[in-house]
Amino acid sequence: VIAYRGGLGMGKTAFTRGLARGLDCRDRVTSPTFTIVNEYQGRIPLFHFDMYRLPDADALFDIGWEDYLDRGGVCAVEWSENVAEALPTDTVWVDLRRLEGEDNGRRITITGVTGF
């Protein structure tokens, strides 16, 4: 699981596009804001989630979250703050922040397990 933290327009979907490219996913990556999850096939599956509209972590189980975890792909989670308590302990966290004084600059901090 890769969990993004950052406000609107910080580049969460853009980061996922790069991830998809690295996994050789051929489909165009779009934000799953209204669908909750988009699936992409590549060397391994990529499941792109947008948790913005979920009321709480309990709603994850209504969308089959555990099934996605068991499918052996990468789960990229936008708005992970809304469901943080339900994410696995080995989640990789990607914090995206705007660089002060720059419209398009970002500081990206990646934390979590090592050796992935």
Task: Show where each model-derived region lies.
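Short phosphate-coordinating micro-motif centered on Lys-Gly-acidic
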Residues: 21, 58-116
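P-loop (Walker A) phosphate-binding loop of NTP-binding proteins
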Residues: 5-7
